[in-house]
Amino acid sequence: MAPPSRRECPFPSRRFPGLFLAALALLLSSRSDACGPPPTFVAMELTSRPKPYYKVGEQVEYDCKKGYHHFAPFLTHTVCDRNHTWLPISDAPCVKKVCHYIPNPAHGQAILANGTYSFGNQLHFICNDGYYLIGKAILYCELKGSDAVWSGRPPICQKILCKPPPTIKNGKHTFSEVDVFEYLDAVTYSCDPAPGPDPFSLVGESTIYCRDSLGWSGDPPECKVVKCRFPVIENGRQTAGFGIKFYYNAAVMFECYEGFHIIGSDTIVCNSNSTWDPPVPKCVK
């Protein structure tokens, strides 16, 4: 049986070495006598699909990317020169699109995040003291189609006004006849005379002020009788805060007799629950 015959390439390099070398030389010369892919830019892009290499004298065109617009008279094309390099070009012709100018709101400020109105940037809004912001505190310059637009309407600064503060049982506050209070307006509470032998104590902050759009700086105080029991300490004595009756915030100090030491605090205060805080100490050997 005869061995199978081998098929040979009709144009092997061994039979036609001259033809093979000529083709290789033509291929190499076509690539060496050319430019590589054209440069890329942040703001521009080619108007046609890039090729691996370009002939000398071949020209490519650029157009501005989305979000950029052309700024004449700069060139937006380049040419493969005889040195097999692209003629210098930059993307300076294409500049970022910008959002329209927004002025400071009345009684406030509009602050650019990085000093320009170009797309991708932010505009921050703040209000002066005595005013609060209604609307979004930050707007973004965004692309909508081919235009640069703000992400919303600019906010406004509204004057801070407070409703009258709460009334309290067994007490009153100043300016009770006023219907509307402005920023930092303050009222002071006081207690009425008590009907019994012990007076009302004002528990809490006596003065609150109109703070912001949420209202007053704190809760109103209470007017109530606060009276702690007479403090008794065995094997010791009072050194300060003497009295017969002990009302809200009354303070008493103690010391132990010789040979005893104190357990607890040497100073106690009558708190709003009519108890001593901390508890009355003890004197032990």
UniProtKB/Swiss-Prot annotation:
Range of residues in the leader sequence: 1-34
Ranges for domain Sushi = 35-96, 97-159, 160-225, 226-285
Q: Which Pfam families match?
A: Sushi (PF00084)
Task: Give one GO biological process term.
Answer: single fertilization
Q: Which cysteines are joined by disulfide bonds?
A: 99-141, 127-157, 162-210, 191-223, 228-270, 256-283
Tissue specificity, please?
Present in blood and sperm. Isoform 2, but not isoform 1, is present at the erythrocyte membrane (at protein level).
Specify the protein's topology with respect to the membrane. Single-pass type I membrane protein
Q: Which InterPro entries match?
A: CD46, Compl-Cell_Adhes-Reg, Sushi/SCR/CCP_sf, Sushi_SCR_CCP_dom
For this UniProt entry, what is the primary localization, expressed as one broad class?
Answer: membrane
Record text on subunit structure and interactions: Interacts with C3b. Interacts with C4b. Interacts with moesin/MSN.
Q: Which purpose does this protein serve, as stated in its record? A: Acts as a cofactor for complement factor I, a serine protease which protects autologous cells against complement-mediated injury by cleaving C3b and C4b deposited on host tissue. May be involved in the fusion of the spermatozoa with the oocyte during fertilization. Also acts as a costimulatory factor for T-cells which induces the differentiation of CD4+ into T-regulatory 1 cells. T-regulatory 1 cells suppress immune responses by secreting interleukin-10, and therefore are thought to prevent autoimmunity.
Q: What is this protein called?
A: Membrane cofactor protein
Organism of origin: Saimiri sciureus
**The organism's lineage?**
Eukaryota, Metazoa, Chordata, Craniata, Vertebrata
